[in-house]
């Protein structure tokens, strides 16, 4: 496991888990506000810190059958990497297990995995060539972290398909899934959320510009900038989620219950 999923004492793990539950619940509520979820069909997960070094790895995820706006910190379930619910009430959706558990297992840096169907990224996924153009300044940093899954039309009903998705993701953070949606990963909840938010905004600009029928202005390839610095050091990502949590604290305080 990466350093961020470190072993904690039982007391520390309990406090840390609640903090992470609140962050995850906030992301579900924010996603609902933006219409990123496909009714009850989407899922977000998070690997949890281990209370002791020999503890089996577990992850947090939304239970099957709930819309994102219904979810609260306490309603999220805890599962092991074999798909068993070990804490909480509810069922783990099989497709969620086959995608999320395999990404977590095969890519330890993917501590948080968000799988949603936001309007603009999903629209781009439906194009013959689903790609983010090098047309907006956001693309200068985003595009090197994007991979396209052009062969994901088969149902995700086993670990083999989950492994294919995980291996294709590799060290990228954004997967545009052709004719489907998007999966975004990160080392923390706030990093994955911020990455998803920026990618969807960038897709919105692209789709809006393309709707004019005019040719997109292409930025020089020499300006492409890879993300510098270790994951977890993107302070603005934490501030971004905190800002949204302040709004939720006022308008939807039950998310943190």
Segments (PLM) and residue ranges:
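Glycine-rich flexible loops
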Residues: 1-257
